[in-house]
UniProtKB/Swiss-Prot annotation:
GO terms for cellular component: cytosol; nucleus. GO terms for molecular function: Hsp70 protein binding; nuclear import signal receptor activity. This is Protein OPI10 homolog. The lineage of its organism: Eukaryota, Metazoa, Ecdysozoa, Arthropoda, Hexapoda. Coiled coil: none annotated. Belongs to the OPI10 family. Signal peptide: none annotated. It comes from Drosophila melanogaster. It holds the Pfam family Hikeshi-like_C.
Length: 197
């Protein structure tokens, strides 16, 4: 029996993790489209080695590329199980595929995801940030920066009649800034990582 188990709501628990090397294991999760949360846990067969944690990773395999692993979080002897939300990770994968023009069948669609477990030193694992938190932090930072710029630029707004007739400054209509602000907000809501492409 494996050290690790996986639970997906409505399915039997899985413990068929396959060793990739001495510190890394994988398990396939079929029909991933309907899965929003999953649980990874220690089965209790034996404890993890002292000073180690099990870092948990998610990958949505792509037939045309190497797996991209996203860190979900960790479990260890003092925290033997954890629930991970993968709905946002699946959505960001779909948005990334659309951004790269892979919408209408130019890419094979995989219905099997993989969960990876990597035994790593506790200090290394403690310094990692889960993928979902990073995406949310990026979105929040982008929105705050957007609001700050909008407020700053709008504080300099003047009516056309107040612009000096002989001025070396370039003036931008405020409606242009408002349109940019609205478009940026919309795009940020649709895909917080749109600016990367």
């Amino acid at each position: 029996m494996s050290l690790f188990g996986l639970i997906v709501s409505g399915r039997l628990p899985q413990s068929d993790f396959v060793a990739v090397d001495a510190t890394k294991l994988l398990v396939n999760v079929p029909d991933i489209e309907s899965v929003n949360y999953l649980v990874v846990f220690l089965t209790g067969v034996s404890p993890l080695p002292v000073g180690t944690s099990a870092a948990i990773y998610f990958s949505w395999p792509d037939a045309n590329a190497a797996p991209t692993w996203q860190y979900l979080g960790h479990i260890n002897n003092t925290k033997p199980s954890a629930i991970f939300k993968i709905a946002q990770l699946k959505k960001s994968h779909e948005l990334e595929a659309q951004a790269h023009g892979m919408v209408f069948g130019s890419q094979e669609i995989s219905h099997i995801a993989q969960i990876g477990v990597s035994l790593e030193p506790e200090l290394t694992v403690a310094q990692q940030t889960p993928a979902v938190s990073t995406a949310n932090d990026n979105k929040q930072f982008g929105q705050r920066m957007l609001e700050n710029f909008f407020n700053y630029a709008s504080s300099f707004g003047v009516a056309a009649r107040d612009i000096p007739p002989i001025s070396s400054e370039t003036f931008v209509p405020f409606s242009v800034v408002q349109n940019w602000y609205t478009n940026f907000q919309r795009r940020m809501e649709q895909n917080p990582n749109f600016w990367k492409y």
